[in-house]
């Protein structure tokens, strides 16, 4: 099964799903824009309309789509438009890209439940859009956290997020 999420910097999202049981592949890339084969530099200009995403392959006998949605919403801020923390731009917007009608329904229902339960103080701005062409990110973005733990962004932003995830979902 396939799932695609945009939740800010793909370095953050990638390592979370790499540590999720049942997820067999996590690839960083770009989706949702209007040019073919975008580069990181082009996407960062904010003019291509692409989102930094991770495309997952998962075994639905080990993890279901609702579990992936729960992880996605717990590990980023779905209430900030075009921003995650200090990362600002349309490439960081919160998006669930669905691959079939069931995923679309599950994502919309999940967001409705969060809104009805007042889980967040502010309204959820996460978009639910049909999956488009997935453009694989440049090689140096792959496995970024694990390959660059000394990078300040990794140690200050990603490591605490990963620890929080591991504490909550691996306990």
Task: Please report, for each region that a protein language model flagged, where it lies by residue.
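Flexible coil/turn and secondary-structure edge motifs
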Residues: 1-171
């Amino acid at each position: 099964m396939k799932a695609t999420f945009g939740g800010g910097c793909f370095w953050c999202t990638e390592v979370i799903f790499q540590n999720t049981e049942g997820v067999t592949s996590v690839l960083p890339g770009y989706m949702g824009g209007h040019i073919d084969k975008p580069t990181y530099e082009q996407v960062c200009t904010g003019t291509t309309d692409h989102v930094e995403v991770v495309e997952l392959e998962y075994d639905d006998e080990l993890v279901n789509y609702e579990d992936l949605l729960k992880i996605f919403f717990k590990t980023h801020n779905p209430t900030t438009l075009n921003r995650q923390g200090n990362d600002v731009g349309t490439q960081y917007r919160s998006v669930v890209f669905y691959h079939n009608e069931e995923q679309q329904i599950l994502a919309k229902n999940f967001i409705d439940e969060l809104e009805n339960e007042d889980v967040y103080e502010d309204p959820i701005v996460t978009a639910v859009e049909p999956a488009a062409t997935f453009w694989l990110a440049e090689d140096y973005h792959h496995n970024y956290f694990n390959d660059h733990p000394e990078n300040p962004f990794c140690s200050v932003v990603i490591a605490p997020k990963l620890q929080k995830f591991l504490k909550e979902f691996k306990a």
